[in-house]
Curated annotation (Swiss-Prot):
It is found in: Secreted. This is Dermonecrotic toxin LspiSicTox-betaIE2i. Keywords: Cytolysis, Dermonecrotic toxin, Disulfide bond, Hemolysis, Lipid degradation, Lipid metabolism, Lyase, Magnesium, Metal-binding, Secreted, Toxin. Mg(2+) binds at residues 25, 27, 85. Belongs to the arthropod phospholipase D family. Class II subfamily. Disulfide bonds join 45-51, 47-190. Coiled coil: none annotated. It comes from the Eukaryota. The active site is at residues 5, 41. Binds 1 Mg(2+) ion per subunit. Dermonecrotic toxins cleave the phosphodiester linkage between the phosphate and headgroup of certain phospholipids (sphingolipid and lysolipid substrates), forming an alcohol (often choline) and a cyclic phosphate. This toxin acts on sphingomyelin (SM). It may also act on ceramide phosphoethanolamine (CPE), lysophosphatidylcholine (LPC) and lysophosphatidylethanolamine (LPE), but not on lysophosphatidylserine (LPS), and lysophosphatidylglycerol (LPG). It acts by transphosphatidylation, releasing exclusively cyclic phosphate products as second products. Its EC number is 4.6.1.-.
Length: 278
């Protein structure tokens, strides 16, 4: 997966999809009460990016619904994964709980109500910290409560705090989440990968490859914009690379030394199926 980073308005969304990105990551802000409000990152953000792009969350959901619906004039077949990077820090536990319910309600309203089941996009609900686990809990409960339990097949989960892998697994076990888990490791592109290192990324890949007992479906690295970093990630066996330059990542993927092992994912590929590094 070539995952376009910080896709927070429609102009940049079109640009990245034109480049060939098959996944987008969007920052979602919340009110103090936990109501999803807008796609917005703000400053500081990645180097060489405009931090203040924004659009309302409802408009964002309507647009991505159109883009992922076959037969719609705006349909883009390469839009497979939508990573919702949830800006939850500072919210109370009650607000987090409400936020999980409201996100489920909004996804259902824009994508799946009224008998609509043909949208092709899959979501990853990306929570910053394991201490905010109640958000995932109430999201899953609300999906069942509103009759959308079957649509959990289109939803995955991720914690982005670069935390201890065993602690993260224990939280997933507590929540009863045993599949559809995307695991990530990374750092802003303003900091050289040399300073971050890849030991935790390698640990995630090892855990993914351990067998049926593992809890990880996919592993992605962020935010990789340099060729050396992208090549290293591919050699380690990641499933996705989040980047500010999707076309650049795809061009590396298509080089002979990598295309024999990798290809860009399509709709026929299950975003939650586990593939081992070879």
């Amino acid at each position: 997966f070539a995952l376009a980073h910080m896709v927070n308005d429609f102009d940049i969304m079109k640009s990245y999809l034109d480049e060939g990105a098959n996944g987008i990551e969007t920052d979602i802000t919340f009110s103090p009460e936990g109501e999803p409000e807008s796609a917005f990152h703000g400053v500081p953000c990645d180097c060489k990016r405009w931090c203040d792009r924004t659009v309302s969350f409802d408009s964002y959901l309507q647009k991505t619904s159109d883009l992922s619906t076959p037969g719609h004039p705006d349909y883009r077949e390469n839009l497979l994964i939508i990573i919702l990077e949830l800006k939850l820090n500072g919210l109370s536990q009650d607000a987090l709980a409400n936020g999980g319910r409201r996100l489920a309600d909004k996804l259902a309203a824009h994508f799946w109500t009224g008998g609509r089941r043909d949208q092709r996009a899959t979501f990853v609900v990306s929570v910053p910290q394991t201490s905010q686990k109640v958000f995932m809990k109430t999201f899953r409960e609300e999906m069942e409560a509103i009759g959308m339990g079957d649509m959990n097949a289109k939803v995955g989960f991720d914690f982005t705090d670069n935390g201890d892998v065993s602690v993260t697994k224990a939280v997933y076990d507590e929540l009863g989440i045993t599949e559809h888990i995307w695991a990530s490791d990374g750092i802003t592109n303003c900091v050289a990968l040399l300073f971050r290192g890849t030991s935790r990324l390698e640990e995630l890949i090892q855990k993914r490859d351990e067998g049926e007992s593992t809890y990880i479906s996919k592993v992605y690295a962020w935010t990789y914009d340099k060729e050396t970093s992208v090549v290293l990630a591919l050699e380690l066996g990641v499933d996705g690379v989040m980047t500010n330059y999707a076309d650049f990542v795809i061009s590396i993927l298509n080089k002979p030394e990598h295309s024999s092992k990798y290809r860009l994912a399509t709709y026929e590929d299950d975003p939650f199926e586990r593939f081992k590094a070879v």
